Curated annotation (Swiss-Prot):
Ca(2+) 2 binds at residues 1502, 1557, 1559, 1565. It is found in: Cell membrane; Membrane. Expressed in differentiating myoblasts and myotubes. The chain crosses the membrane at residues 1961-1981. GO terms for cellular component: plasma membrane. Keywords: Calcium, Cell membrane, Membrane, Metal-binding, Repeat, Transmembrane, Transmembrane helix. It comes from the Eukaryota. InterPro entries: C2_dom, C2_domain_sf, C2B_Ferlin, C2D_Ferlin, C2E_Ferlin, C2F_Ferlin, FerIin_dom, Ferlin. It comes from Mus musculus. The gene is Fer1l5. Belongs to the ferlin family. This is Fer-1-like protein 5. Plays a role in myoblast fusion; probable mediator of endocytic recycling for membrane trafficking events during myotube formation. Ca(2+) 3 binds at residues 1824, 1827, 1830. Induction: Up-regulated during myotube formation.
């Protein structure tokens, strides 16, 4: 296969609208495309694969690469193309060809600045497990393969908002293979979120489903991504406990972030969940996609029942699939937060892809110890994004209350190895042992960024700290799983070292708090780290974790701020955590590398001009710093005793990546700089996340009225101190940083909470001895209490306090007597108590206001005579409180009045300003006021107002005023001044120093300063632990009773839960030396403010905010790209910071874009924030150049950008003497302009306009066009009769204008349509704003035609010896078959184009008749420029439109912009709109033919998951289509219809195609619709009116359909391009065109043999036309959309449109696209016999036997199941039947599928048509009388691709069913029964035994396929019934084995005994024979050995003589006679003569 990895691209010069780029790659006319990525430097790293099959690469092979921009509304914009020759790869197939920075060409084939980077390689079968159609069904146990399949590496997430959005999930189930089980009836359950969908029940182990399920969502993306998808295959015939066959699970987030949001045609391994013996139990082929608004579903062109999938992909080389087990070692938890519950029973729940396991419940404790192991079985690849942990409260037998949650990203605890280029294999998931932080409570707002690597980070978890869990994760790969849950034993002792804790100290200095909304109450900040510092947690020591209460002050424009000035509050929090410094050091080093790279990249991206010299300088700086950072070694983890497996694996991964990046930076060249740097940054971001950062984040809460309002989360590692050095410390450790606060989710969405500027330090307290965060200032620690007094009878004292204590805190909630304070350990009292007012609380409410409205109400009462007299209290405020009289109200110092008191008359009052009412006791104030006097009214009042203005002061006075404010805020002792320091007021109102006549309450603040003791080795502020006041248990009982009843007057609306609020000291950092600065902001322009480029900005202006100061630019008129060209100057800015600290971390400058709505209200559009450039002098100062900065909206989405720059200059002593401002900035009318050094350069540009006409405008009479650009305007002539001809009488216009030389700075072009009405009135009826002019810039001298490229003709190469051997000995499966050419039609062309049915079609002339199938709209094909090459369509809107404003019309036109010489004598460039269609030819009458092919994946509308679609066409007033012609019960209808319409273009130009769902009773629902602009197709120069065929045929099935011949088309094309007409020779085989001669032989290597081709002249002209990039004969795929779900894909429709203008002659012939009708076939299957069938029954003699019968059916036609008779008592597994099965099917030969139409239910209105593959199912069964029949085996044959049967039993085996053989010269023979219509032989049957398939029998069959006609000619009956012929089947001769026992018992007994004990008898006989031989040998061996040893040689010379010693016989006395041997007379020599004599 050929693999192309598309890495990245660079689009230069950048487009004003952020492009959504993708790359399309063509190889051998097969197109593949990448996903869409936003940005000018997109990075894909996406792999595209083409299968070469048996066609290897040749020297002339090439790739065509096209870079496109997917713009809005289904249009795509061409960017550039290039061709990559593959000659080098063909010659060196083992190498990888890297193509870096490939320069793209434009339409004129000229180089552009856009580049693409990719690499190409060839992959062979032995190198990968991927085979056939990119489907993976197994993998080996190779470690590298397993790790690379774990999770998707380097995910790229696009930013999503937190508001609910429309989403859609689709799951299409194709088929299953190799499902385990016997005689199963599988059904697939698809669970999407909580909705379950079921397929139809099928039969067999390889079922075919082809069903699709939809699920729509309207959810927040965070919740949508968390939902799971579960696909389960169950056996519907089995019991519920044994029904599950296998399942597959994933989460939607994983699918959404996959390429194309889709898993396309993937084989899923099915496994049983948590089963110890479970393996892969089958495979399921599915397509899963998750789509959002605007996402396009991938088009699957293949047939669902295509048979290209070979059996070998189901066979793995070593193991079926990679199975692994994730073991979770759950140790313990700590610091669990139970909320309102005092105790809970904690249980830890772990969730992985929907599977959940829980630990055992523990006793109620906040530190539970579980010590358990939870085991999950996973399949590699594990298609999940994260692991969830939840600690639940199960105290009430229900685990519903969640204590806290955490999550782990699989991509962060594992690696696929994709981060590093090379052989790095990654590592499997592992974690810990380490702590995970639990969170709960309020959630943060959802945001995802491109830098994120996990969508679950800080998304679904809360903000509040809920404790930590101590866990460990281990991945094991083994064949058998352990128990799901078990207890830990020895592992606990190995992790005890994790419990060692160290004391950490956290110090935070608050420097400023600005950009706040208005708070009526006092605010304070709380800092916490875990539970430490949380005031509401009583389990921890009180710490100095909160600041003093402060008010918020108005800044003079929009926001408020906290007036800290030189007194900065400080908090100090101590905590105890384990030592993770070794881990944080590595993380901080990586963050330094990433941050410096990102900073340099942002600067690089902001330089839009490629000719800017700063571009290369910044690139060199980036490379230099990256090399320095990457060569810095990371702390080694191999020698770290506390490091775990994940630490070591990540250290290895990070180290190798840094080494690789350093080398790449060293070799990098200045090409595609932004894209290369973005790729490096992306790879760094992938390895940076540290999941084992067990330290919780630092939380800063903004609190008001004891409620947490807004928060900021600071990662602990960013402020952590490291003794290893500053590089290992956090980037903000001891440094000033800017923090933006956020509201929790769902709160405060309309305001900005605050912008904080803080300095933080976190570290081990032993390193804090010499802690000094700021370079100047001193720290003050003091205790505080307030003395309270009330006024009773004109005397101040404690008598009138009632519920308020004598001494309390600032809120009056707690008693704090001075005698109860005690110094904390390590500190002592420095002085005695002194009175020091908190002047921050006493600031004037009118500070920073330029004008104040004062009001006094004059009150009168009606006396007894009815006259009005002054009331008892004549002057009050609006609430009735007494105030001074009008004449006594004095103007404060520094203010003045312009007008005196006047009566306000602009509300419901009478002519004198009085309003009347009836007084209601006891207050006497009326509840309702009326403007008309009645006799019963008892009182009246009127409102007197006046405005006072602040005096304007000079520079010196301003400084003195600033010093006054500072001196007022300074803390000082008042005892020496004779003042007592009392503050007058109430807790509900503001306190002030001056008493008022109505004052009844006063208080004063007492301070006592603390001083640290002698040095203790740590910073003294970390010793401030515990409460300063005496605990309540130490107080007297009376005092305790008194404190219980204390109430702070009337303002205690929120009381704390614990009344014992701890008393802690307050810490302040005093900075007495201020520094003054001047800030210069240069603002030029804002653009790209709307993605759809519709709305204009009404009176926009920019507000610049810097700390507590803000200024605004001038307000402009309405504009889509407002240009201010203005400088904003802030003078005398006061900062209490060291200038070096300010230069290193300056405050942020905030630019806010505002506009006005129709009511005049200000609306915030977006903000842009960045730090200014700081200059501490003007020695090296230069102007800061303008840069583009993104505008961020309220939810974090970047939309729009602003061109600006800022610089902050310190006012040194020399600069203070200069007149402000210190820089010379030009000023005009009081407005500072941009300095000339940074203004864009202007140049004269020519703008040509081709104004074609107006469309779809109603109620206009004489419209005309008005164009405005850069202060210049142009008007066209009005259209005289708009209703008859909406085109302009003159189409081309020209004018010049001065524009910026840089295209990115071009001013917008405004197109207005002005209607001339009666009496000369002109009204603007429509407007379009074109602010993106870059596509219209052109080179006027370039040529506008495409050169003809001659094709490279292939030359047949001579066969080599290996080729000869291959062809000689390779047995092709189709070698012996005749060439099969079936009848071709238009559908054949479609299948040739989509690649379907390749095996079934073998048409010799296929190459002559090809068409192009586009998977998108024709307008979306990049090469055709949206069919708007002649004129573009601009939507017209109202003059002041809103977001939902409708389109009021369209303007069709085009623009060309190019430099124009200012010298009148210079040559003028040629006009661009010279050769265009004659405008007099329009309107035109046209004949339109609409060919509707089919629809794909329509949205279901009915309850059965289907719909009944029908088509309605609308064109002008014409409407075609009928609801009666609906297609019942289908989501993929095949229309095959042609509609013919007549229209008048352009009056009738919009063709609307609607699909409706037919409903019998209710109204029909619209499925979706699509609109085609016919005028664009008619006018386009790409010939879109009629696609160009590949061949010119005068007759035949593919007859030329255009109304013009190719030669005339070529003549018109040359005329359109301004070229001379082509000239043909007399014979027509040569052509002179555009200065070149072309011959027909250049395109045809040999004379064509196809008989229907036309003459040579036309063929040659057609060849030339096909090289010009014209629209070919095609089928386009259009997306359907519906108003019910805007932006969501509702399905696709494939179609094409032909347009024939009547002025060009009669139209061409129609194309017959009628759907193919299936042919009826009859399959006759004769079951002759079986053999070697398993025997499953026992006879009386324990003999195995079976009663065999055979069952068969066609797949999908299970209701027509047939079976043979029963062969009883088979003792050998042999059975004879002679039985005929007859099956009838409707078969589509071209699609290789059977078609069936039947009703699902009796009450169904229409039948449902289904297609399924032609498969024959044969099963062997054992017949039982009482119990269910036993299943013995199954055979499944695909009739279109089946193995050739064996001719004898011995050759029949399971190897026949394999598609590929192990040996290349012995392939398995495969046939199609539709071609070879009759076969006979043996086939194997198999049965599942355990988890493996084995041979269970063999069946001999004859399969015969007959057409319907042949079946009528040769009729036959089923079984053995009549007509029993062809052939005649006789009943088999079967002997009843049961009766044979009685007929020949001895014979049968011997047979039974021999059969049963055959082996035993043979063994016994052999044993007896061997035993007899051995016994005989043992018996004879001793004698033989003895004789052999002795060797006797016996020789006898004479016999032995016997002598009668008695002499005579005494017969009378026999008893006395004795016979003796005379041995004494003979010698031994007589016996042995050889013996020597004695």
């Amino acid at each position: 296969m050929l693999r192309v990895v598309v890495e990245s691209a660079s689009i230069n010069p950048p487009l004003s609208t952020t492009p959504k780029a993708f790359v399309t790659v063509y190889f051998r006319d097969m197109m593949k495309r990448t996903r869409v990525e936003e940005g000018h430097d997109p990075i894909w790293n996406e792999t595209l694969i083409w299968h070469l099959w048996n066609q290897p690469l040749e020297n002339d092979s090439f790739l065509k690469v096209i870079l496109q921009d997917s713009v809005s509304k289904k249009k795509e914009r061409f960017i550039g193309l290039a061709t990559v020759p593959l000659k080098r790869l063909a010659q060196r197939p083992k190498e990888v060809m890297f193509v870096r920075d490939l320069i793209l060409l434009n339409h004129s084939m000229k180089p552009t600045n856009c580049t693409v980077t990719l690499h190409v390689a060839q992959i062979y079968d032995q190198d990968t497990e991927m085979t056939g159609n990119e489907e993976l069904l197994g993998s080996t146990v190779n470690e590298v393969t397993q790790k690379k399949l774990m999770v998707s590496g380097l995910p790229m997430h696009r930013a999503l908002a937190s508001k609910p959005q429309h989403f859609q999930v689709r799951v299409k189930v194709f088929e299953a293979r190799q499902l385990l089980g016997n005689n199963i009836k599988p059904v697939v359950k698809v669970n999407i979120a909580d909705q379950q969908h079921l397929t139809r029940i099928k039969m067999g182990n390889n079922p075919f489903f082809n069903e699709i399920f939809f699920q729509n969502f309207h959810e927040v993306p965070a919740k949508f991504f968390e939902e799971n998808i579960s696909i389960e295959v169950v056996d519907s015939a089995a019991s519920r406990s044994k029904a599950e066959i296998g399942r597959f699970q994933t989460d939607i987030g994983f699918i959404y972030h996959s390429p194309g949001h889709t898993l396309l045609r993937k084989w899923l391994g099915l496994c049983q969940r948590n089963k110890t013996t479970s393996g892969v139990r089958g495979y399921l082929k599915v397509t899963i996609c998750a789509l959002g608004v605007g996402d396009q579903a991938l088009v699957d062109q293949k047939l669902p029942y295509e048979q290209n999938t070979r059996v070998q992909i189901f066979k793995s080389k070593e193991v079926p699939v990679s199975l692994a087990y994730l073991q979770f070692f759950i140790y313990c938890a700590e610091d669990l937060h139970f909320g309102t519950h005092k105790s809970a029973t904690p249980v830890l729940e772990v969730e992985l892809i929907g599977d959940k396991l829980r630990t055992k419940p523990q006793n109620p404790s906040d530190n539970p110890i579980w010590n358990q192991i939870l085991t999950f079985q996973i399949q590699l690849p594990c298609l999940s994004s994260y692991i969830k942990f939840r600690v639940m409260d199960c105290s009430k037998y229900k685990c519903q209350d969640e204590i806290g949650s955490a999550s782990l990203c699989l991509s962060q605890i594992s690696s696929t190895g994709e981060e590093i280029q090379g052989m790095y294999s990654g590592f499997l998931p592992c974690f810990g042992p380490s702590f995970l932080t639990l969170r709960g409570g309020k959630k943060p707002p959802f945001r995802t960024s491109e830098e994120g690597t996990c969508i679950m980070d800080a998304v679904q978890h809360g903000l509040a700290y809920r404790g930590r869990i101590f866990v460990e994760i281990v991945t094991k790969i083994k064949s058998q799983q352990d128990s799901v849950m078990k207890d830990l034993s020895q592992e606990v002792t190995q992790v005890e070292m994790q419990y060692y804790r160290q004391k950490y100290g956290l110090c935070v200095i608050f420097l400023s708090c600005t950009m706040m909304p208005k708070f009526k109450d006092l605010i304070q900040f709380e800092v916490s780290m875990g539970h430490y510092g949380n005031k509401t947690d009583p389990n921890y020591k009180p710490l100095v974790s909160t600041t003093q209460y402060s008010p918020v002050i108005y800044d003079g424009t929009t926001y408020h701020y906290v007036p800290w000035y030189n007194t900065k509050p400080v908090v100090a929090v101590t905590s105890n955590w384990e030592d993770v410094g070794f881990r944080m050091n590595c993380l901080n080093l990586l963050h330094i590398t990433r941050d410096r790279l990102k900073t340099n990249l942002d600067i690089l991206k902001s330089i839009r001009n490629p000719r800017d010299p700063a571009l290369l300088q910044q690139w060199e700086k980036l490379l230099k710093e990256l090399q320095e950072d990457c060569r810095r070694p990371l702390p080694c983890m191999t020698d770290q005793p506390r490091a775990n497996s994940l630490d070591r694996n990540k250290w290895q991964l990070r180290s190798q990546l840094l080494q690789q990046l350093a080398q790449m930076a060293k070799e990098a060249k200045p090409v595609n700089m932004v894209g290369t740097a973005k790729e490096w940054l992306h790879r760094l971001n992938a390895v940076i996340p540290e999941p084992q950062e067990s330290l919780p984040d630092v939380l800063i809460w903004l609190m008001s009225r004891q409620q947490r309002v807004a928060y900021a989360r600071v990662p602990a590692h960013t402020v952590l101190f490291s003794p290893a050095g500053p590089l290992s410390s956090g980037k903000f450790c001891g440094k000033i940083q800017n923090i933006l606060l956020q509201y929790p989710e769902g709160e405060g969405q309309d305001t900005f909470p605050a912008s904080l500027r803080v300095c933080m330090w976190l570290g081990n307290v032993k390193y804090s001895k010499n802690l000094k965060l700021l370079q100047q200032g001193s720290m003050v620690v003091y205790a505080e209490t307030y003395e309270n007094q009330a006024k009773t009878r004109d005397d101040w004292g404690q008598q009138g306090l009632y519920h308020c204590p004598n001494f309390s805190d600032v809120m009056g909630r707690k008693a704090l007597p001075k005698t109860d304070f005690k110094a904390p350990p390590g500190w002592h009292w420095k002085d005695d108590w002194v009175v020091e007012p908190q002047r921050r609380l006493l600031l004037d409410i009118d500070i920073n206001k330029s004008q104040v409205l004062e009001e006094v109400y004059e009150n009168q009462l009606r006396n007894a005579t009815g006259a009005w007299v002054p009331a008892a209290i004549p002057n009050t405020d609006v609430n009735g409180q007494p105030v001074e009289a009008l004449e006594n109200v004095k103007c404060p110092q520094g203010w003045h009045f312009k007008k005196n008191w006047i009566v306000k008359l602009n509300h419901a009052v009478d002519s004198e300003g009085w309003e009347y009412g009836v007084g209601i006791p006891p207050s006497g104030l009326p509840q309702i006021w009326n403007s008309v006097e009645k006799t019963y009214h008892s009182c009246r009042r009127r409102r007197w107002v006046r405005v006072r203005f602040r005096n304007h002061k000079e520079l010196g006075q301003e400084r003195s005023q600033e010093q006054e404010t500072l001196s007022f805020l300074q803390m000082q002792d008042l005892s020496e001044e004779g003042k007592e320091g009392w503050e007058y007021g109430t807790f509900d109102s503001r306190f002030h120093l001056d008493p008022q006549p109505t004052s009844r309450f006063r208080r004063r603040c007492w301070h006592r300063q603390l001083a640290p003791n002698k040095d203790r080795g740590v910073a003294s502020i970390f010793l401030l632990e515990g409460s300063l006041a005496v605990e309540q248990k130490d107080q007297p009982r009376k005092e305790m009773e008194k404190t219980r009843s204390w109430q702070p007057w009337k303002d205690l609306r929120h009381t704390p839960e614990d009344p014992r609020i701890p008393t802690t000291p307050f810490i302040y950092y005093i900075l007495n030396k201020p520094h003054y600065y001047q800030l210069f902001c240069y603002i030029y322009q804002a653009r790209n403010l709307m993605y759809n480029q519709i709305l204009t900005f009404q009176e926009p202006f920019i507000q610049v905010v810097f700390l507590n100061h803000s200024l605004c630019t001038q307000t402009l008129r309405s504009s889509a790209a407002p240009t201010w060209s203005q400088s904003i100057i802030f003078q005398h800015l006061l900062l209490f910071e060291d200038p070096k600290d300010t230069r290193e971390n300056p405050p942020l400058v905030v630019l806010e874009l505002w506009q006005h709505d129709s009511r005049g209200n200000k609306i915030l559009w977006g903000r842009s924030m960045w730090p200014p450039v700081v200059w501490l002098g003007l020695q090296d100062w230069v102007f800061t150049p303008l840069r583009w900065h993104p505008l961020v909206r309220e939810l974090g989405e970047e939309e729009g950008e602003i061109l600006a720059s800022c610089e902050l200059i310190l006012e040194t002593q020399k600069l203070k003497e200069l007149h402000p401002p210190i820089l010379s900035i030009p000023c005009k009318d009081g407005i500072y302009l941009l300095p000339k050094n940074i203004q864009p350069t202007m140049k004269m540009m020519a703008i040509e306009i081709m104004a074609w006409g107006l469309r779809n405008m109603t109620k206009v009479r004489y419209p005309q066009l008005l164009l405005e650009c850069g202060g210049e305007s142009l008007k066209t002539e009005p259209i005289s009769n708009f209703q008859e001809n909406p085109n302009f009488p003159t189409s081309t216009f020209f004018f010049t204008v001065f524009m910026p030389l840089e295209e990115t700075h071009a001013q917008p072009l405004v197109v207005k349509v002005v209607d001339n009405q009666e009496y000369g009135q002109q009204i603007v009826v429509g407007q379009a704003n074109i602010d993106f002019l870059q596509p219209y810039f052109c080179d006027p001298w370039s040529l506008n035609y495409t050169t003809v490229k001659l094709p490279t003709l292939s030359v047949k190469k001579p066969d080599t010896f290996l080729d000869f051997v291959y062809k000689k000995f390779w047995f092709d499966s189709s070698k012996d078959e005749e060439v099969y050419e079936e009848e071709v039609d238009w559908w054949s062309k479609l299948f040739w184009a989509t690649g379907d049915a390749d095996k079934s079609l073998n048409y010799n002339h296929k190459s002559y008749h090809t068409l192009k199938v586009y998977d998108c709209e024709l307008e979306a094909v990049l090469t055709f420029k949206g069919l708007q090459d002649f004129c573009q369509t601009f939507k017209l809107y109202q003059e002041k439109p809103k977001v939902d404003s409708p389109v009021v019309g369209e303007f069709k036109g085009l623009f060309r912009i190019y430099p124009f010489p200012e010298d009148p004598e210079a040559p003028k460039p040629p006009r661009q709109f010279s050769a265009w269609p004659e405008i007099e030819d329009f309107p035109q009458m046209c004949l339109v033919r609409v060919y509707l092919i089919r629809a794909i994946n329509l949205q279901p509308q009915d309850y059965n998951g289907l719909c009944d679609p029908y088509v309605i066409l609308k064109l002008g007033q014409t409407k075609l289509g009928s609801r009666d012609s609906y297609y019942p019960n289908t989501l993929d209808p095949i229309f095959g219809m042609m509609y013919e319409l007549t229209c008048n273009i352009p009056l009738e130009k919009d063709l609307e195609i609607q699909l409706f769902d037919f409903d019998l009773i209710t109204a029909d629902d619209e499925i979706g619709s699509t609109v085609i602009d016919l005028e664009n197709r008619l006018l386009s120069g790409f010939g879109a009116r009629c696609g160009l065929s590949k061949s010119y045929c005068k007759s035949g099935p593919f007859k030329w359909r255009d109304q013009m011949t190719p030669s005339y088309l070529l003549y018109r094309y040359a005329k359109q391009k301004g070229l001379p007409p082509p000239v043909f020779d007399l014979e027509g085989d040569s052509l002179y065109y555009n200065g070149e001669t072309f011959k027909l032989q250049s395109f045809e290597s040999a004379p064509p043999t196809y008989k229907h081709l036309g003459p040579k002249k036309e063929r040659l002209a057609l060849y030339i036309l096909n090289t010009q990039g014209l629209v070919p004969e095609h089928v386009e795929t259009r997306t359907l959309h519906s108003n019910s779900q805007p932006g969501i894909d509702q399905g696709k429709i494939q179609m094409w449109v032909d347009i024939f203008p009547k002025m060009l002659g009669p139209p061409g012939p129609q194309v017959n696209i009628s759907p193919r009708k299936p042919k009826r076939y009859q399959l006759r299957c004769i079951i002759w016999s079986t053999a070697e069938v398993d025997l499953v029954q026992e006879t009386f003699s324990k003999e195995k036997m079976s009663d065999i019968y055979v069952k068969g059916w066609l797949f999908g036609l299970e209701e027509d199941t047939q079976k043979t008779d029963v062969h009883y008592h088979s003792l050998t597994g042999e059975a004879t039947f002679n039985w005929r099965f007859i099956f009838t099917m409707d078969y589509l030969t071209t699609e290789r599928a059977c078609v069936q139409s039947q009703k699902d239910y009796i009450w169904s209105l229409d039948p449902t048509s289904t297609k399924f593959p032609a498969r024959l199912m044969i099963q062997i069964w054992d017949n039982d009388f009482f119990s269910p029949d036993d299943f013995l085996g199954v055979l499944e044959l695909d009739l279109s691709d089946m193995p050739l049967p064996a001719q004898n039993i011995k050759q029949c085996s399971l190897k026949m069913m394999e598609t590929d053989s192990k040996w290349p010269f012995t392939p398995q023979k495969r046939i199609s029964l539709f071609k070879k219509t009759n076969v006979t032989g043996w086939w194997p049957c198999q049965v599942l035994d355990g988890d493996k398939w084995r041979l269970s029998g063999k069946v001999k069959m004859t399969l015969e396929m007959l057409s319907e006609r042949e079946a009528l000619i040769r009729p036959a009956g089923r079984g053995q019934s009549e007509p029993n012929q062809f052939p005649m089947l006789h009943p088999p001769e079967r002997n009843d084995s049961f009766l044979l026992w009685y007929q020949s018992p001895i014979k049968n007994f011997c047979y039974a005994v021999c059969k049963r004990y055959r082996s035993k008898i043979i063994c016994l006989v052999v044993t007896l024979v061997i035993g007899f031989i051995l016994l005989n040998f043992v018996y004879s061996a001793p004698s033989y050995f003895a004789m052999n040893w002795i060797k006797p040689q016996l020789r006898l010379s004479s016999p032995i003589k016997i002598v009668n010693l008695i002499g005579t016989v005494n017969t009378s006395n026999i008893n006395s006679s004795i016979l003796t041997m005379e041995g004494s007379t003979y010698h031994a020599s007589h016996v042995f003569p050889e013996a020597p004599a004695p």
